[in-house]
């Protein structure tokens, strides 16, 4: 990346013909930048057959080297050649080929000396060392974020006089004046009304606490949005749609940089502490990927190869989910199912190791003080019954309906934000939403507490020692019967909690729509789980009371006798949380594993699977896209979804450019164009690459050359090769013919020429073309007829065609 910057910052092209290089690669044009390129322009590219190498030792990567090397200034690699522009897509085939060549070279050298053998071993070990570092950094940052967010969330309600750095729970841990009924009240913890007016009783004290709660929330939100806007605009949002796009090969420079990491970490704490309806789990994936990208720069193997770096980012995403949920296996499956585009077996092992180290690091930090990796770890002891699958499936249906509703409304609101004046005032928008959230949340204790604490409360299986209102049942039993509590009639506290939870459900459903997508770090996992957990707890309590009062009904009498512990409302909350999260994200396997790891209950996998699958079916029936795919399409990222089938009967000739009545395809000839001719084409077009043909008359294809490589090579030749002028002939052939005396030196650029561009015929079905683009990660392919070049299909053309076939606006596939 540093080399790329150097090459870009020192362009100094002759005659001013390249002044528009940085901005000239248009997404709309023929060779659009968001595709993936078959560009074998690097010296480390796919080699010829071994026998050819033996015959000609001068092989140099782009083709067989010429014996006439006088004018071939590219015998030495040029910094910048073969690298990628911002908002460009990598060439997966070339990058993997370069890595194979590098590995082959190291293996061959390791047989020659001990030092080379040591280098080979260190190269093989470097991947595991990098995973270890990513796990350590991700776990440490997650622990720091958890501890800071917990303290700052409690700061809205009061402060610990025994040490301001203690949160509410830690402040009262060592207090000798804590009663069992009020474990959260101790003399060391003072609310703001106690500090300001010396009392915690009465209407005025309530108003003071209310005012301070709203004030702190606005302050935290203002700091978060201001830091994002001023220092790191890429630190906003969840980050998962962009991570998916980057892992598919797209380059967004700075998105995984140092500033983004620092600002995202700080503002994530502020955003979570503000009380907005958002979570830290999605942004933690972004934070972990930032750690992975930054650490990659310490290893040449990953710094110089974009495909290898994306393998590391896939593992980093697994580590991010591992520390977000305390679910290392779920993290690996999340990376495989949801975010990764290319996931070889080696990446699976390394993702597992990175997730393991990250979880171990977080467990060592113990941010919640409960020796668990998450705040809402619970264990259930009562088995579920077959009849309960019916309410579990109902929760799945609710989750699917909620997911589809949320995606449609949130995307509509985000589109309005992008297309109206609303998007120009992100600070005001954040402050308004924060003020509304805080004002509505404070009166209800279930919305006033942090969302993670709310989920923990909803998942909780009530015991004898629980003092929560959700556990305020009437005790009509003999406690000597055993540890398991029978179903009991609900008390006044439970009924009060029910209507408060119903109001909390409405608030969470509505306010999350407007919160996700604002210019602050905002995850969606926790708000979605909260919606489902509230709905599940309400249904669970209803089922529990139904079983208690009507245990003689046919549906209950076979398995639920009076005085037995039949229904676990906390389990319903967990199933509802899984259903709603699945409805929004469309995750299935990874979701079930994450929820299983959260609860430690192997026997509850079937209810979770039933709810997750039902929610996905219902949500898919109402809209095919999950929230992350919908945001990818909204932002116009060039992401070619591998899960969708292309079923239309169109041909390559229907999609390729140029079309009929369009200008002819811009091409370069292999041996008849001058430097000035090429410079003119580059300055007058915005294509990011050009086919090279034998001649304009024959249109026989020779290869493909990238615009960026051309510019850097010509610039370098003018600086380092004497006599290269505008009238110098550019050769892409293996041998340059003898030139008359006194003619300017020729410029040989064969080494930047991709000699094996991917081609299809004009009658190739588009379903095959789309499959090729997906599976090979192509950036473009050339279309031929009887060996003659006809046109070109880029990744952008494929995406536009898919949108057009789906009756969508093809111009929406424009990255902005």
UniProtKB/Swiss-Prot annotation:
GO MF term set: antiporter activity; ATP binding; identical protein binding; voltage-gated chloride channel activity
Alphabetically ordered keywords of this record: Antiport, ATP-binding, CBS domain, Cell membrane, Chloride, Endosome, Golgi apparatus, Ion transport, Membrane, Nucleotide-binding, Repeat, Transmembrane, Transmembrane helix, Transport, Ubl conjugation
DNA damage as UniProt keyword: no
Record PTM: Ubiquitinated by NEDD4L in the presence of albumin; which promotes endocytosis and proteasomal degradation.
TM spans (from-to): 125-162, 208-231, 256-275, 281-300, 348-366, 389-414, 422-442, 498-518, 523-542, 605-622
Binding-site residues, chloride: 238, 525, 628
Membrane topology label: Multi-pass membrane protein
Motif Selectivity filter part_2 per UniProt: ranges: 279-283
Description of how the protein assembles with itself and partners: Interacts with NEDD4 and NEDD4L.
Entry protein name: H(+)/Cl(-) exchange transporter 5
């Amino acid at each position: 990346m540093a080399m790329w910057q150097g090459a870009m910052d020192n362009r100094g092209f002759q005659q001013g013909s390249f002044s528009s290089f940085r901005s000239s690669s248009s997404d709309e044009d023929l060779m659009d930048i968001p595709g993936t390129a078959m560009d074998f322009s690097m010296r480390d590219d796919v080699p010829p057959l071994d026998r050819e190498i033996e015959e000609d030792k001068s092989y140099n990567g782009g083709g067989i080297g010429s014996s006439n090397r006088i004018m071939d200034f590219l015998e030495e690699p040029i910094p910048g050649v073969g690298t990628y522009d911002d908002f460009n897509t990598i060439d997966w085939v070339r990058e993997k080929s370069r890595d194979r060549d590098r590995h082959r070279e190291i293996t061959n050298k390791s047989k020659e000396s001990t030092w080379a053998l040591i280098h080979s071993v260190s190269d093989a070990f470097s991947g595991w060392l990098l995973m270890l570092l990513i796990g350590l950094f991700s776990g440490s940052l997650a622990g720091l974020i958890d501890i800071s967010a917990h303290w700052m969330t409690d700061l809205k309600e009061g402060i610990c006089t025994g040490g301001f750095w203690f949160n509410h729970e830690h402040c009262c841990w060592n207090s000798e004046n804590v009663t069992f009924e009020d474990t959260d009240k101790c003399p060391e913890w003072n609310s703001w009304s106690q500090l300001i007016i010396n009392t915690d009783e009465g209407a005025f004290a309530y108003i003071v606490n209310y005012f301070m709660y709203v004030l702190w929330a606005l302050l935290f939100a203002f700091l978060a949005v201001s830091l994002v806007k001023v220092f790191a605009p890429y630190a906003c949002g969840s980050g998962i749609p962009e991570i998916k796009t980057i892992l598919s090969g797209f380059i967004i420079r700075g998105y995984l940089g140092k500033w983004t990491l620092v600002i995202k970490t700080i503002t994530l704490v502020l955003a979570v502490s503000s009380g907005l309806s958002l979570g830290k789990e999605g942004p933690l994936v972004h934070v972990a990927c930032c750690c992975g990208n930054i650490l990659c720069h310490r290893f040449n193997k990953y710094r110089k190869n974009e495909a290898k770096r994306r393998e590391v980012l896939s593992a980093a995403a697994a580590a991010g989910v591992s520390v977000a949920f305390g679910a290392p296996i779920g993290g690996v499956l999340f990376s495989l199912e949801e975010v990764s585009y290319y996931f070889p077996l080696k990446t699976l092992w390394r993702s597992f190791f990175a997730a393991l180290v990250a979880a171990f690091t977080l467990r060592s930090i113990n941010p919640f003080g409960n020796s668990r990796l998450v705040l809402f770890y619970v264990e259930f002891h009562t088995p579920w019954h077959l009849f309960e699958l019916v309410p579990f499936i109902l929760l799945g249906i609710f989750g699917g309906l909620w997911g589809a509703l949320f995606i449609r409304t949130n995307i509509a609101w985000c589109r309005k934000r992008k297309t109206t004046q609303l998007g120009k005032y992100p600070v005001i928008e954040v402050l308004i939403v924060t003020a509304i959230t805080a004002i509505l949340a404070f009166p209800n204790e279930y919305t006033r507490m942090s969302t993670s604490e709310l989920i923990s409360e909803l998942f909780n299986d009530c015991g004898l020692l629980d003092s929560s209102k959700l556990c305020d049942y009437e005790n009509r039993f003999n406690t000597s019967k055993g540890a398991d509590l029978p179903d009991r009639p609900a008390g006044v506290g439970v009924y009060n909690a029910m209507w408060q939870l119903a109001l909390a459900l409405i608030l969470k459903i509505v306010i999350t729509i407007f919160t996700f997508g604002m210019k602050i770090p905002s995850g969606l996992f926790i708000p979605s789980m909260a919606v489902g957990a509230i709905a599940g707890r309400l249904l669970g309590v209803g089922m529990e009371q139904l079983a208690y009062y009507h245990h003689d009904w046919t549906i209950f009498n076979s398995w639920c006798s009076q005085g037995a512990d039949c229904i676990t409302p906390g389990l319903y909350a967990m199933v509802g949380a899984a259903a709603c999260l699945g409805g929004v994200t469309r995750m299935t396997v990874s979701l079930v594993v994450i929820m299983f790891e959260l609860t430690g209950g192997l026997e509850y996998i079937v209810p979770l699977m039933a709810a997750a699958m039902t929610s996905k079916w219902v949500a898919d029936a109402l809209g095919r896209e999950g929230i992350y795919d919908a945001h990818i399409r909204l932002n116009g990222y060039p992401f070619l979804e591998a899960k969708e089938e292309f079923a239309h009967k169109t041909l390559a000739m229907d999609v390729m450019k140029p079309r009929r009545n369009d200008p002819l395809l811009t091409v370069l000839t292999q041996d008849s164009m001058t430097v000035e001719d090429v410079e003119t084409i580059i300055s007058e077009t915005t294509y990011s690459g050009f086919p090279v043909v034998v001649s304009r008359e024959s249109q026989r294809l020779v290869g493909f050359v990238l615009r960026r490589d051309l510019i850097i090579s010509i610039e370098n030749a003018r600086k380092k090769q004497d006599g290269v002028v505008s009238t110098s002939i550019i050769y892409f052939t293996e041998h340059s013919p003898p030139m008359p005396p006194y003619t300017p030196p020729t410029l040989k650029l064969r080494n930047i020429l991709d000699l094996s561009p991917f081609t299809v015929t004009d009658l190739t079905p588009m379903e095959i073309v789309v499959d090729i683009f997906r599976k090979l990660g192509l950036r473009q392919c050339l279309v031929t007829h009887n060996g003659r070049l006809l046109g070109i299909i880029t990744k952008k053309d494929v995406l536009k065609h898919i949108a057009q076939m789906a009756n969508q606006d093809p111009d929406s596939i424009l990255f902005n």
